[in-house]
Swiss-Prot record:
Gene source species: Tolumonas auensis (strain DSM 9187 / NBRC 110442 / TA 4)
EC number: 2.8.1.13
UniProt superkingdom: Bacteria
Localization terms from the record: Cytoplasm
HAMAP family referenced in this protein's UniProt entry, alphabetically: tRNA_thiouridyl_MnmA
Function: Catalyzes the 2-thiolation of uridine at the wobble position (U34) of tRNA, leading to the formation of s(2)U34.
Pfam families attached to this UniProt entry: tRNA_Me_trans, tRNA_Me_trans_C, tRNA_Me_trans_M
One function term, GO molecular function aspect: ATP binding
Name assigned to this protein: tRNA-specific 2-thiouridylase MnmA
Length: 369
């Protein structure tokens, strides 16, 4: 058995059950374990929105129970500069970004990794993500988590082999019910705490209200695919492709009663374009163009290849053909048309269990490009 007693691991403690159990499992494996709670957002409103104080208290309670030290660090400035401003710029441009992916890239596996190594003397960091690391080839690879329902590799595709080499993912080999069972057996404060669903580090506040504070809303009209004005929107940023609820339009006189879906955004005209029916052709794409590529092995792809892709979290794998257009642009053609492919979101590629990397969806296409 490996002697881990001289190896120091700093666990990112979020105040949730996954990071709590991660710390315990590493302790059981003999590592020197300490926790780190990251504060990445300055509270600017009432406690009902912001759970940071509760999360910190929960993280502290778990560390006390396990007998490990908890450090705290404030990355609010880094979060604002490297995550939030880009997040706002993307929304302003009419796209729908994924801040959790950016947060993992810039905060958890960059700012945290550097702070843990340089200030706390860590050999590794660890998080409660449901992914696995494979070292069998000599270059650390990122694998999907064992629990298919909880696999979070989609959110970690920007990591390099080098970052993975410095990271441990203790719950990646477990299923969520097992993790909760361990927490309950230990009597951890986080055992029954529900999973967070809010934007990374900003909590579960009302999103439209939150976004409206930072970006002035620009109301405009809602048009059908035929150009008929049928309503008004409060701002393109509040809508995403494939959205059905919250449009404020019902059936039209002399029209069918099928629900309306967002099928496009005309940013130049500030017009939201809708169509009726979940199978309307305008909802579907034959493929996409992606840029800002991050391959885990950091090797530029120059030859076409086949694999599977996800264009959003928890989506079924889509067989596809990937054709590099230049070093930072790829054309992806789906085996069958896909609904609601959304610019600003990430396309993430897999070969079997391995996450190869991904990129940001620049545009979607139908027919040939």
């Amino acid at each position: 058995m490996t002697n881990n007693s001289q190896i120091k691991v700093i666990v990112g403690m979020s105040g949730g059950v996954d990071s709590s159990v991660s710390a315990y499992l590493l302790q059981q494996q003999g590592y020197q374990v300490e926790g780190l709670f990251m504060k990445n957002w300055e509270e600017d409103d009432s406690d009902e929105y912001c759970s940071a104080a509760t999360d910190l208290a929960d993280a502290q309670a778990v560390c006390d129970k396990l007998g490990i030290k908890l450090h705290t660090v404030n990355f609010a400035a880094e979060y604002w500069d490297n995550v939030f401003e880009l997040f706002l710029a993307e929304y302003k441009a009419g796209r729908t970004p994924n801040p959790d992916i950016l947060c993992n890239k810039e905060i958890k596996f960059k700012a945290f990794l550097e702070f843990a190594a340089e200030d706390l003397g860590a050999d590794y960091i660890a998080t409660g993500h449901y992914v696995r690391r494979d070292d069998s080839t000599g270059h650390p690879r990122l694998l999907r988590g064992l629990d298919n329902n909880k696999d979070q590799s989609y959110f970690l595709y920007t990591l390099s082999s080098e970052q993975i080499a410095q990271s441990l993912f203790p719950v990646g080999d477990l299923e969520k019910p097992q993790v909760r069972a361990i927490a309950e057996q230990l009597g951890l404060a986080t055992a029954k705490k529900k999973d967070s669903t809010g934007i990374c580090f900003i909590g579960e506040r009302k999103f439209t209200e939150f976004l409206g504070r930072y970006l002035p809303a620009q109301p405009g009209v809602i048009e059908t695919v035929d150009g008929k004005v049928i309503g008004e929107h409060q701002g393109l940023m509040y809508h995403t492709l494939g959205q059905r609820k919250g449009l404020g339009i019902g059936g039209l006189k002399d029209g069918d009663e099928n629900p309306w879906y967002v099928v496009d955004k005309d940013v130049a005209r500030n017009v939201l374009i809708v169509a009726q029916g979940h199978d309307h052709p305008r909802l579907f794409s034959d493929g996409l163009i992606a840029k800002q590529l991050d391959w885990v092995d950091r090797q530029v792809r120059r030859e076409p290849f086949d694999c599977v892709v996800k264009t959003r979290y928890r989506q079924q794998d889509i067989p596809c053909h990937v054709e590099p257009l230049d070093d930072d642009t790829i054309k992806v053609t789906f085996a069958s048309p896909q609904a609601a492919v959304t610019p600003g979101q990430s396309a993430v590629f897999y070969l079997g269990e391995e996450c190869l990397g991904g990129g940001i969806i620049e545009q979607r296409f139908s027919g040939s490009v």
